[in-house]
A protein has these predicted regions:
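Conserved Class I SAM-dependent methyltransferase catalytic core
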Residues: 86, 217-282
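Short glycine/threonine-rich catalytic loop with a Thr-x-Gly-x-Asp
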Residues: 94, 125, 272-275
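Soluble or luminal CAZymes and related metallo-dependent hydrolases
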Residues: 4, 8, 54, 147, ...
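Cationic, amphipathic, low-complexity alpha-helical segments enriched
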Residues: 287, 291-299, 303-308, 312-319
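Conserved SAM/SAH cofactor-binding pocket of Class I
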Residues: 100-197, 201, 224
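Mobile active-site "lid"/loop adjacent to the S-adenosyl-L-methionine
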Residues: 191-221
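Conserved AdoMet
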Residues: 33-107
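A short N-terminal interaction module
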Residues: 1-58
């Protein structure tokens, strides 16, 4: 039997309402766009009363969605700022918080003219951070690393799909850069930082890779980076991390332990939900445009210079942390 897109939409909408299934109606539209291979929402509306291209495929995807599988895994796509990435359950779905980190990093890069830099993205997952850096700074050398072979396959796939050239290394330790004599100007990372499993939503536990979310001790990774920063960073450098909301005090002490130069400065920034989420460390730069505290000289100055992304069309981290 043939069904129009309108009929499929109304039937699906009735299904989720009658059975009280937690699926946003807008996702039904997006599934229809995907199945019909339309370019955008306008194309769907124009063809709303036309026959759906593949009702069996729609039903298969819709059933996965009703079972609680994240939409990005169902359609194998996730948007990240201005990029569209392939994702599956071997990698974490890119989050709006990481988009916020990109906004901050690009502001610092532009203000300090770091466009021709060597950039490391550690714990890359889908490659979202490294690929966005390459997309916005085409003359930079970008190296991404991850301990997961499957994640690296996806990062490579996204690199090819986007026609963005990056280098890929398998490791979650700094030694891979030391062995390859790689030093960088910019070091970025969104490592696993959740310690308590009760802090995570069921759909994350069920579908997303736990090694990309959980860690036994969420300070160890950062301490390793701080301890060996002189071996992997050039004299002038930027380091930027996503962190857990409760790490600020502990990381401040670690920074004071390992960064002993007067010209090394750092600050913590909040995400759009008001939680401490970003750590920025700058070495060798005369920074004078945003709130920062130097642990040694104990000076600071203020200027609010960035605004984080609105999140009405973005995917929340699904963590209570």
């Amino acid at each position: 039997m043939d069904f129009t897109n309108r009929e499929v939409y109304l039937k699906s909408l009735k299904d989720i309402k009658e059975h009280k299934i937690n699926v946003q109606p807008s996702l039904i539209y997006q599934l229809l766009i995907k199945v019909n291979e339309f370019e955008n929402f306008t194309s769907l509306i124009v063809n709303f009363d036309s026959k759906i291209k593949d009702i069996d495929k729609f039903n298969q995807l819709f059933n996965r969605l009703k079972n609680g599988e994240p939409f990005e895994y169902v359609v194998n796509e996730a948007s990240f700022v201005s990029l569209m990435l392939y994702v599956d359950n071997n990698v974490l779905i890119p989050r709006v918080e990481t988009e916020g980190l990109m906004n901050i990093v690009n502001k610092i890069i532009d203000d300090n003219k770091l466009n021709d830099s060597t950039i490391i993205d550690m714990c890359t997952g889908s490659g979202c951070i490294g690929l966005y850096m390459k997309y916005t700074h085409r003359n930079s050398r970008v190296i991404v690393s991850d301990i997961s072979k499957e994640a690296l396959k996806i990062a490579k796939k996204n690199s090819e799909n986007l026609n963005l050239e990056i280098e890929v290394l398998e490791s979650d330790k700094l030694d891979v850069f030391l062995k390859n004599h790689i030093k960088c100007d910019i070091f970025l990372s969104n490592p696993p930082y959740v310690e308590r499993k009760e802090d995570i939503f069921d759909e994350v536990k069920k579908y997303e890779p736990m090694n990309a979310v959980f860690v036994e001790n969420n300070d160890i990774f950062y301490e390793e980076c701080f301890k060996h920063y002189k071996e992997v960073m050039n004299d002038k450098f930027l380091m930027a991390f996503e962190i857990n909301y409760d790490q600020k005090e502990r990381l401040t002490k670690l920074i004071g332990k390992y960064f002993t130069n007067d010209d090394t400065k750092f600050l913590f920034l909040k995400d759009i939900f008001g939680k401490d989420r970003y750590l920025i460390i700058l070495g060798g730069y005369d920074v004078n445009y945003f709130e920062m505290w130097s642990w040694k000289s104990n000076w600071y100055y203020k200027k609010r210079w960035f605004s984080l992304f609105s999140y009405w069309n973005s995917f929340w981290f699904r963590l209570y942390c």
